[in-house]
Amino acid sequence: MNRVNVYIDGFNLYHGLRKMKKSDTDWQRFYWVDFVKLFDHFILFGQTLQKVYYFSAPDHDPFRAVRQDALFRANKLMNDDRFEVIYGKYYRKKLKCKLCTGRYVTHEEKRTDVNICAYMMSDCALNNVDAIMLVTADSDLVTPIELIRRDYPNKQIRLFFPPTTESRDLTNVMKAKKKEPIYLLNHKQKFINSLLPDVVSKDGTSLTIPQKWKDPYIISTPSNVIPNNLMSLYAKHFGDAQIIEFDHPNMQSFIKNLNQLTS
């Protein structure tokens, strides 16, 4: 029986789902998914899903961090040792707004691609796996794929692109061995079939789906309040950035410039 491990680039997958829900709100429910069950649907004849590794970092936003923790704990509760989270780290970056005199803080995730590479190579070297499912669109992982093929030619590799994401470099490295990447966007029914129950209970422990994921119309209040008529525009441009200073002498000009940038 071929042993399969799944290596999920959590940052890629989360942001792929986040983009997808803008055109189809059903995809917001797929934040609350059983990862072992989801990728069990992709197992081939003669294979068995041994373990799912989810590579992520503790979210810098306290509200998202609580939701993230609930998801990880629910998956662990359902799957025991078949699910494991490998943590990287978010680093703060202070940037200057190009449209105003303000400054803002954003965060950059580090270590995920290195951690994925290290765990895949280690599992191959120790013969802990026969087949790899890699979930990412990060072209930095081209090299470890090539090295595994060179040094461990009997190890199978299948590539999965998160919704709304893809990589030409990764596609080419797969096609070099006459393999095609799998687009998770085309497998909505598998996500539906892999949803966790709204309340996950086991051995006296219960975890509930975060209300924001259950109801797509709930909006979180930001910790730093900016003028309401700018909130949606600012979010389009800066995403999850946290405003630390906001001072612009010509608000109408700022709105006009921001509209042009985000249209």
Features from the language model and the residues they span:
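Nuclease catalytic cores that cleave nucleic-acid phosphodiester bonds
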Residues: 84-262
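Domain-level signal for Mg2+-assisted phosphodiester chemistry and nucleotide/NA-binding surfaces
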Residues: 1-106
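Short, Lys/Arg-enriched, disordered terminal segments
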Residues: 1, 262-263
